[in-house]
């Protein structure tokens, strides 16, 4: 029986394995492991790719989001408006930066922060709005940014899943005051482990990010801020440099696979992903909705097909928040999605045989 894993990291690395091996050899010969030539080159290349003003590599997506928030030096106890449907790292970054997460509901089609839910969540303590480009679908940024400007708030993109995604022709990472990316190894642009990236519009914000990233280290013997160890290393930067040139082609293949799925599943009793007309989705995750999620997941497992759930427990119901200040607005759409969502394999290395196996297996589950 054809095997279709949810992700296939071996296949993803096959085209660049020799290039990465050669780059690693050069790094080992030189033994400059942090903030060296590969880091500096990748920072320049990815900043240009995002059409951002400034950019900085760091150790993970969670650290990137934390850096992006801390760089603005908000007052302790500031409120950050975030979508309730997101990976928990979005919430963690707010808490780590000394803030209070305020969770709002999502748009029922895009699954991103619903701009119409934001204004009612704003209080005198609100400092920042943090839309998440969930699954690789850009949030509707223009109304969010306008609303933030009207209330003198900052906007930080959580672009952890949005490498190469575009909003009205503009790349994720260039749409707000700052943005945070994750290069976790399963991402569309993934490291060989962990890494992250922040972009910013203001050079002063970037300089504060640099200090925070490296222990507040201003000169050899001087630390001007209480910072962190959030550096990206040369090995991860070398991997990302090897992968970046293929990102657009890989995203295009994800869109082609998603289109095949959408057509094949159009008559079935399920909801397929919606790509907003203003967005160029990168399909980091191909997420469907069905009332029979657990049954379908079990059936696909029997067919040797991997699935996932992104995400089963809404952020506002996580036990970690019981002792942490937070607010949750009405979240009916989030609750419904978390009860019904299922992720199917959708990545550029899938073969035609694997794609057809997924299509046939899903079709057999729902019947004629």
Regions found by a protein language model. Name each.
Residues 56, 81, 102, 155-156, ...:
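Structural detector of well-ordered beta-strand residues that form the stable sheet scaffold
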Residues 70-159, 166:
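PLP-dependent aminotransferase-like
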Residues 92-94, 147, 171, 188, ...:
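Hydrophobic/aromatic ligand-binding patch that stacks against planar heteroaromatic rings
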Residues 10, 38-45, 49-55, 116, ...:
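PLP-dependent aminotransferase class I/II
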Residues 174-211, 217, 234-237:
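Active-site PLP attachment segment
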Residues 157-190, 220-224:
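Conserved active-site segment immediately N-terminal to the catalytic lysine
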Residues 31-79, 93-97, 103-105, 170:
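Phosphate-binding glycine-rich loop
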Residues 1-30, 37, 345:
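N-terminal "arm"/small-domain region of PLP-dependent enzymes with the aminotransferase-like
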């Amino acid at each position: 029986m054809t095997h279709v894993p949810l992700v296939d990291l071996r296949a993803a690395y096959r085209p660049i394995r020799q290039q990465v091996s050669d780059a690693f050899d050069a790094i080992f010969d030189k033994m400059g492991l942090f903030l060296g030539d590969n880091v500096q080159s990748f920072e320049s290349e990815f900043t240009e790719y995002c059409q951002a003003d400034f950019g900085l590599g760091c150790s993970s997506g969670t650290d990137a989001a934390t850096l992006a928030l801390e760089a603005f030096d908000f007052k302790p106890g500031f409120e950050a408006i975030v979508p309730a449907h997101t990976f928990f790292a979005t919430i963690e970054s707010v808490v780590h930066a000394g803030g209070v997460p305020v969770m709002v509901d999502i748009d029922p089609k895009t699954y991103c922060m619903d701009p119409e839910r934001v204004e009612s969540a704003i209080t005198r303590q609100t400092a920042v709005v943090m839309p998440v480009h969930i699954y690789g679908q850009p949030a509707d940024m223009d109304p969010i940014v306008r609303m933030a400007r009207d209330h003198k708030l900052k906007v930080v993109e959580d672009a952890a899943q949005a490498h190469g995604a575009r909003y009205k022709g503009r790349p994720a990472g260039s749409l707000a005051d700052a943005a945070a990316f994750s290069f976790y190894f399963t991402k569309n642009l993934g490291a060989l482990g962990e890494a992250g990236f922040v972009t910013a519009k203001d050079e002063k914000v970037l300089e504060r990010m640099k200090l925070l990233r490296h222990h507040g280290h201003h000169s050899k013997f001087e630390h001007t801020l209480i910072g962190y160890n959030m550096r990206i290393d040369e090995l991860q930067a070398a991997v990302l440099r090897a992968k970046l040139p293929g990102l657009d082609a890989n995203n295009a293949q994800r869109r082609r696979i998603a289109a095949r799925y959408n057509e094949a599943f159009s008559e079935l009793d399920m909801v397929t992903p919606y790509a907003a007309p203003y967005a160029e989705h990168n399909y980091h995750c191909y997420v469907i909705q069905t009332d029979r999620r657990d049954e379908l997941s079990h059936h696909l497992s029997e067919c040797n097909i991997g699935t996932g759930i992104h995400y089963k427990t809404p952020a506002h119901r996580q036990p970690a928040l019981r002792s942490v200040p937070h607010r949750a607005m009405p979240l009916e759409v989030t609750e419904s999605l978390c009860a019904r969502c299922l992720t199917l394999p959708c990545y550029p290395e899938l073969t035609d045989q694997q794609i057809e196996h997924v299509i046939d297996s899903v079709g057999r589950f729902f019947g004629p």
